[in-house]
Amino acid sequence: MLPPLPIPPDRPVLIAGPTASGKSALAAEIVGRDGGVVVNADALQVYDCWRILSARPSVAEEAALPHRLYGHVPRRGIYSAGHWLKEVEAVLREGLRPVIVGGTGLYFSSLTNGLADIPHTPPEMRHEADAFLARAGLSAMVADLDPATAGRIDLRNPARVQRAWEVLRATGRGLADWQAATGAPLLPLAETVALVLRPDRDWLAERIDRRFDLMIEAGALEEARVALADWDPALPSSRAIGAPELVAHLKGERTLDEAIAAAKLASRQYAKRQRTWFRNRMRDWREIRLP
């Protein structure tokens, strides 16, 4: 799958693409051929609980090549783009050529464009936001945002809206205002080989469905069962596609076939959002058309 373009062995490589497009295999191929370290840029693959459901590299794959930032955060832990950037900075200091791979666009934009130093909001603000969202709903929370922020974030994403609402309430400044004060990037795009995978939609949909079937065979239901006792849908780790659907099955709320169908649909919808994000935000990246 190596792209038909030169990749200097000492130059950092960035690989972005939608779920199930073959990003990890390409990263491993590059590191296996030229050396370096595979660095995770997927917000769900950082969690220790979802090796199967997040499609993390297998134990054997991680042992065969250097890997960083995979499965090192506990399921109930909070992990942000800021945490990720600090850990990537530490990886860069190791001196190995990084091949940074994943599907979380915010991580890549933070890496190559910089990340605003937005203060953490106190726990009591999170509780206030939770209560407001439950009482008034997402549309009311959106209405409270400043216009600049409302025009920049995904207003259909409750987590993004709530984060912006909390920042505005806690600091008196909108999230967009904080982001305007962004510092220098850790790894400017011009210093990298930046690749974005552009798979055919139908080809990708077939791969998504087939991969989830393989996840079920590999034990995805057992992974979800481990999380069942203290399942909290509000946790960032609970956004792993397939986890809410399988937990619903384990609670008796839907059949296994219904859960699998819902997870496949959620994966295809997520891939569509990723493709849109990459198309709009990664116009300076080199495209690799698939298949």
Curated annotation (Swiss-Prot):
Example GO molecular function: tRNA dimethylallyltransferase activity
Alphabetical keyword list: ATP-binding, Magnesium, Nucleotide-binding, Transferase, tRNA processing
EC class of the enzyme, as a word: transferase
Matches recorded under InterPro entries: Dimethylallyltransferase, IPT, P-loop_NTPase
GO biological process: tRNA modification
Chemical reaction(s) catalysed: adenosine(37) in tRNA + dimethylallyl diphosphate = N(6)-dimethylallyladenosine(37) in tRNA + diphosphate
Residues annotated as binding ATP: G17, P18, T19, A20, S21, G22, K23, S24
Residues annotated as site: Interaction with substrate tRNA: T104, R126
KW ATP-binding (keyword) present: yes
Entry keyword annotation includes Hydrolase: no
Binding-site positions, substrate: T19, A20, S21, G22, K23, S24
Its EC number(s): 2.5.1.75
Entry cofactors: Mg(2+)
SUPFAM superfamilies linked: P-loop containing nucleoside triphosphate hydrolases
Function description: Catalyzes the transfer of a dimethylallyl group onto the adenine at position 37 in tRNAs that read codons beginning with uridine, leading to the formation of N6-(dimethylallyl)adenosine (i(6)A).
Family as reported in the entry's similarity comment: Belongs to the IPP transferase family.
Alphabetized HAMAP family for the sequence: IPP_trans
Quaternary structure, from the entry: Monomer.
Protein's UniProt name: tRNA dimethylallyltransferase
Organism of this sequence: Cereibacter sphaeroides (strain ATCC 17025 / ATH 2.4.3)
